Amino acid sequence: MRCVPVFVILLLLIASAPSVDARLKTKDDMPLPSSHANIKRTLQIHRNKRCCPGWELCCEWDEW
């Protein structure tokens, strides 16, 4: 019975807590790209390159 007031107070504190946006923001409030997007973009750039000069395996890899 002693725990009920503590439980109610905790519920009220949790309900009144401000929500937190998990996305990173700039000072202009624009979302920043995630590291996953940066990695994906970097891999796409390397994948789109034609052949590596002097290395035939790279050309075969691009055909996959």
Swiss-Prot record:
Processing after translation: Contains 2 disulfide bonds that can be either 'C1-C3, C2-C4' or 'C1-C4, C2-C3', since these disulfide connectivities have been observed for conotoxins with cysteine framework V (for examples, see AC P0DQQ7 and AC P81755).
Signal peptide bounds: 1-19
Signal keyword on record: yes
Keywords: Cleavage on pair of basic residues, Disulfide bond, Gamma-carboxyglutamic acid, Secreted, Signal, Toxin
Modified residues (4-carboxyglutamate): 60
Locations listed in the record: Secreted
Single GO MF annotation: toxin activity
Domain of life (superkingdom): Eukaryota
Domain characteristics, as noted in the entry: The cysteine framework is V (CC-CC).
Name listed for the protein in its UniProt record: Conotoxin mr5.1a
Originating organism: Conus marmoreus
